[in-house]
From Swiss-Prot:
NCBIfam families: ATP_synt_6_or_A, PRK05815.2-4. Keywords: ATP synthesis, Cell inner membrane, Cell membrane, CF(0), Hydrogen ion transport, Ion transport, Membrane, Transmembrane, Transmembrane helix, Transport. F-type ATPases have 2 components, CF(1) - the catalytic core - and CF(0) - the membrane proton channel. CF(1) has five subunits: alpha(3), beta(3), gamma(1), delta(1), epsilon(1). CF(0) has four main subunits: a, b, b' and c. It holds the Pfam family ATP-synt_A. Its main location: membrane. GO terms for cellular component: plasma membrane; proton-transporting ATP synthase complex. The chain crosses the membrane at residues 36-56, 91-111, 121-141, 147-167, 196-216, 220-240. Key component of the proton channel; it plays a direct role in the translocation of protons across the membrane. This is ATP synthase subunit a. The gene is atpB. It comes from the Bacteria. GO terms for molecular function: proton-transporting ATP synthase activity, rotational mechanism. It is a multi-pass membrane protein. It is found in: Cell inner membrane.
Length: 248
């Protein structure tokens, strides 16, 4: 939280919680088991447990796990159908998995002394690049060269179309960057603010205010954890729609 400096003051280290460390000591290399890998594993286990337990017993009066699983299933199914149409439902399993992984990783990251994989650009950029590569390949496979019409704004004045095409191409290739930074940045910011409040809790005079701040921020972070997973998923659906229907 906060360490004592040589002069007697407190030094806050809100970014220390995001450091990637080796689980068994030593330097971090390509194949070193790290805290990131551990908590991504926990997130996958949480998703599997929730969906398996939630779908194992389909009772008339659903259990909590069944209610959560059915709610998540219906929520994402409707999102995919509304944005991408019936044709996009074949990608529902992938989008559902993506949403559940992100939301579970975000929620597990709210546990004290845990680690949040989605606060790292290295993790979120892989998720975003997977979406980008998938929709780009799908766009060309389904539409051929007609997919390039996505970048040609036919409704604009003829003189502006080449300029707008360049802007559209740049914005298309920036998608994975903005897609990943939005998620990692928001998650990191919230956790850093909580850590700062936790540091101030060590000061007697302001500790009551700091504790109230931590409580309020935790409540906000629960909401942000869901919203960021929702935003990432809905943007994935929008990009998928562009690949399926580039003319719309």
């Amino acid at each position: 939280m906060a360490d004592k400096a040589e002069g007697g003051g407190l030094v806050f280290k809100p970014m220390e919680q995001f450091e990637i460390t080796a689980l068994f000591g030593g330097d971090v290399t390509w194949y070193t088991p790290t805290n990131t890998a551990l908590w991504m594993g926990f997130s996958i286990i949480a998703v599997v447990l929730l969906l398996v337990v939630g779908s194992s017993k389909r009772a008339v009066v659903p259990s909590r796990a069944q209610s959560v699983a059915e709610l998540a299933y219906g929520f994402i199914y409707k999102m995919v159908e509304d944005i991408c149409g019936k044709e996009g439902l074949k990608f529902f399993p992938y989008i559902m998995t993506l949403f559940m992984f992100i939301v579970c990783a975000n929620f597990l990251g709210l546990i004290p002394s845990s680690f949040t994989p989605t606060s790292h650009f290295a993790v979120t950029v892989v998720l975003a690049l997977a979406v980008f590569v998938t929709v780009t390949i799908l766009g060309f496979v389904k539409n051929g060269t007609a997919f390039l019409s996505l970048f040609w704004v036919s409704s604009a004045p003829l003189a502006l179309r080449p300029v707008l095409a360049i802007i559209e191409i740049i914005s298309y290739f920036v998608r994975p960057v903005s897609h990943s930074i939005r998620l990692a940045g928001n998650v990191m910011a919230g956790h850093a603010v909580i850590k700062v409040f936790a540091g101030f809790a060590a000061l007697t005079l302001v500790s009551p205010v700091a504790i109230l701040g931590i409580t309020a921020m935790y409540g906000l972070e629960v909401l942000v954890s869901f919203i960021q997973a929702y935003v990432f998923t809905i943007l994935t659906c929008v990009y998928l729609k562009d690949a399926l229907h580039p003319h719309h």
